[in-house]
Design a protein with these regions (language model features):
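Surface segments flanking catalytic/ligand-binding clefts of nucleic-acid enzymes
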Residues: 29-32, 37, 43-44, 52, ...
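Short gly/ser-rich loop at a beta-strand->alpha-helix junction or flexible surface loop bordering the NTP-binding
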Residues: 1-253, 388
Length: 388
């Protein structure tokens, strides 16, 4: 029996209150919340109906709909994502990302269209269905892990499929689920609430039914690492406690497996990559007697400040006592203005006696190099005088 309904109702009120107060809520750019708790899904490619495109193409070519030239023109300009919808080829995911998916998919399929785009197409073709699983996570503002997953819909009909990449998996739930309503350019689509999406995604990550690339971490199975990444993102976006996760996943995830994943969870991690670094380096850090915390606020003089005080920077990971500062630098840190700001902050921290390490996604993939860098950092930090 699904146990997260009460938390989902609380989240709806929390989100609505935050939107009324500030005009926004803490989600990814793909989703905004209206004051009533309705999602407005905006910033990903819209699936295009094939029938009007085919008619328009035939008119432009001045041929009948059945002509092979119409099909050839469609194939040149569009990629089909479902039985009745397509996207322009310019809206397809990068080739390197699409090519990486078959190795992880149980049937070796690839999905050139993103999960949210496919979800909208399948929802339009299946009136009354509710988007669930990884596609629901994407619509709820957590798209990072979803693109290579099959679209899943809750439906009153029997469970089946998919038989090919253009079909969704239809699931008949044992118990009814109260859906949230999303809107994309005025069209409504039903989506499962956050806690139900979390539970189903964690279950599939732990079972290995859906997977994505993660580095090998000694002592941790890839399935558990992925489950921790998913939990961290939901906790960060929807501000969930460990107790919320336990309650919300009741009936969907085995208690013992969930407890093991929660023990490794960091609710302050801003991305899946930020989840990985502590998992990789934790044995080294603990071996040197150093405890690292996430999201540490520092003032202009490099000393810690409270949540309501002005701050110069927020450490992604660090130790006040051992004067360690760690940052995760994503692609946005390559911008000139951001690089200048990062350099200024690094110089200020070094002047304040802190040791600074900036970690990129490429460094996380090379676990051996990351371990060596953290070992050197910890050895230096442990041998220095501690902060008073």
């Amino acid at each position: 029996m699904y146990g997260g309904a009460e938390i989902d109702r609380r989240l709806r009120w929390t989100i609505a209150a935050e939107v009324r107060r500030t005009g926004r809520f803490n989600t990814e750019s793909a989703v905004a919340f209206a004051a009533g708790g309705v999602l407005r899904v905006e910033s990903f490619p819209e699936p295009i109906g094939l029938s009007p495109v085919r008619r328009h193409t035939a008119e432009l070519l001045r041929v009948s709909l059945s002509e092979d030239t119409v099909t050839a023109e469609l194939l040149a300009r569009y990629h089909r994502v479902s039985r009745e919808h397509a996207i322009t080829r310019g809206d397809m995911k990068p080739d390197w990302l699409v090519d990486s998916e078959p190795a992880r998919h149980p049937r070796g399929w690839r999905y050139p269209a993103g999960a949210a785009t496919r979800a909208l197409a399948h929802a339009r073709e299946n009136p009354g269905a509710v988007v669930t699983g990884w596609a629901a996570a994407a619509l709820l503002g957590i798209p990072e892990f979803s693109d290579g997953a099959d679209t899943q819909l809750l439906t009153r009909s029997r469970s089946r499929g998919p038989d090919d990449p253009q079909e969704p998996r239809l699931i008949r739930p044992r118990n009814p689920v109260e859906a949230w309503q999303a809107r994309h350019r005025g069209l409504a689509v039903a989506v499962v609430p956050p806690m139900y999406a979390l539970g189903t995604c964690v279950r599939e990550a732990l079972s290995g039914r859906h997977a994505w690339d993660v580095p090998a971490i000694p002592g941790l199975a890839g399935e558990r690492v992925r489950a921790v990444q998913v939990i961290d993102r939901f906790r960060r976006v929807f501000v969930l406690s460990a107790a919320d996760v336990r309650e919300g996943c009741a009936g969907l995830v085995h208690n013992r497996e969930l407890a093991k994943a929660l023990k490794l969870s960091d609710p302050s991690a801003d991305s899946g990559w930020e989840t990985l670094t502590p998992l990789i380096v934790d044995p080294i850090v603990r071996g040197h007697g150093i405890a690292l915390r996430s999201q540490i606020r520092l003032g202009e003089d490099g000393s810690p400040v409270g949540p309501d005080e002005p701050c110069m920077t927020v450490l992604d990971l660090g130790s006040v006592e051992f004067r360690v500062a760690v940052y995760y630098d994503g692609g946005n840190h390559l911008e000139r203005r951001r690089r200048d700001r990062d350099a200024k902050i690094t110089a200020s921290l070094l002047a304040a006696g802190r040791m600074v390490l900036r970690v990129s996604a490429g460094m996380v993939r090379d676990t051996g190099d990351l371990v060596r860098r953290f070992t050197a950092l910890c050895e230096s930090a442990a041998g220095r005088p501690r902060a008073g």
